[in-house]
Regions:
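Beta-sheet-rich non-transmembrane sensory/scaffold domains
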Residues: 2-231
């Protein structure tokens, strides 16, 4: 999560609903899953929320790190929240009110036509998991995942680790038993669902930025790399 001391708001992302891949047993938007919650720093009361993926059927939780930045948008300085979401879309929100300001894909996605004026996804038909398997991008791992992104006020660019990939999503009926894995399906990659990963510096990890220096990033093997910031 992130904290704005001026607004005294804590911003926290939430996980996906369960079962992950069988949405038939949990109708509706499934609030407040796959959302960012703005919580009062003193009381914990919710000031506002924004749901990235209503009725998520692909395990695209919203546990990415929200980046807080003051940006110029349409000639006006806005207190913004920048969020590259696991569902493959990038969002800019007003962090005071939760208003959706803009959004667009940053990774390969085939499940939505785009976002409406309120930031709600316009779903494509026949993209829900099925018994036979439904080919959808991004994969369950998402267009990005847990790794921290970064924002440079010098270049006005967001730096994020991104994946391009697609998978077959399967659904099945499953009874809930306390303590058991409750997924209601699964995913598969292979010849029919090539798991293509695109990244400039593999494998991914957090990204850190200095005021004028390069974007510094690590990998799961303990190596550290640096990439020049380009405007």
């Amino acid at each position: 999560g992130s904290y704005d001391p001026e607004l005294n708001l804590v911003y926290w992302g939430t996980g996906n609903p369960g079962p992950d891949w069988n949405g038939d047993v949990r109708e509706g938007d499934n609030l407040y899953a796959d959302s960012v919650l703005a919580l009062d720093g003193d009381t914990g009361e919710m000031s506002w929320y924004f749901q990235f993926t209503p009725h998520d059927e692909h395990d695209w939780d919203a546990i990415q790190v929200p980046v807080l930045a003051d940006i110029d948008l349409d000639g006006e300085t806005r207190k913004a929240m920048l969020w590259a979401n696991r569902n493959g879309f990038y969002y800019t929100l007003d962090r005071e009110t939760g208003e959706f300001l803009l959004g667009k894909p940053f990774a390969k996605q085939t499940w939505a036509e785009g976002l409406d004026e309120n930031g709600r996804p316009i779903r494509r038909p026949d993209t829900s998991p099925s018994q036979e398997g439904t080919l959808v991008a991004p994969i369950a791992g998402g267009g990005t995942n847990w790794w921290s992104p970064a924002f440079s006020p010098r270049t006005n660019l967001m730096y994020v680790n991104a994946f391009d990939g697609e998978a077959l999503f399967f659904s099945r009926e499953q009874e809930y038993n306390e303590g058991d894995n409750f997924t209601g399906g699964g995913t598969e990659t292979g010849a029919q669902a090539p798991h293509r990963v695109k990244r400039r510096h593999p494998p991914p990890a957090d990204v850190a930025l200095g005021l004028a220096g390069p974007a510094v990033h690590g990998d799961i093997h303990g190596a550290v790399g640096a990439t020049e910031q380009k405007e």
